[in-house]
Amino acid sequence: MPIHSSVLELIGQTPIVKAQRLDTGVCELYLKLESANPGGSIKDRIGLSMIEAAEKRGDLKPGATLVEGTAGNTGLGLALVAQQKGYKLILVVPDKMSREKIFNLKAMGAEVRLTRSDVAKGHPEYYQDLAKTIAEQTPGAYFINQFGNPDNPAAHEFGTGPEILEQMGGDLDAIVFGCGSSGTMTGLSRACLLYTSDAADE
């Protein structure tokens, strides 16, 4: 087994296992274990994708501050990547987030700012809107903006999707996934569409 120079090299290429003790009827059910990512979820993929794409474009300079609003695991993925790459990270999270998750974010080096969870998008204290404001008011800051960032679905279009298709040998009828920012849905849909188009051409 190889020795890796960075934990970021462990993101992706997660295993697939066949469900054995579940009643799946006439179907065969396979589970892709995204919990095997170093940060514990599929969000490691988009954290790496969004930060590295910004680096390649020149949007991120050494020592920059990253800012994002998150109510879920994206914060953990970003904290993992930011810590490894030496960026300061400010995360704006709703006050309903679990204490355990907040402790984890802080332990990984993120600055956590709590905001109200009882307001909707468009309100200045809504976590996404507040994160954008903080980014605009912080010199040298870069707003990740997972909900409008094309590098979010790209992580799945060029990463997760091709992995699944390769591991399954293209033999699958449906994919079931959770949906938040819609990055997983968009990226996997594009990957599957490209695969079926290529298969039809053959």
Model-derived features: positions:
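PLP-dependent amino-acid enzyme catalytic core
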Residues: 1-197
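A short, hydrophobic C-terminal helix/tail in secreted or cell-surface proteins
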Residues: 198-202
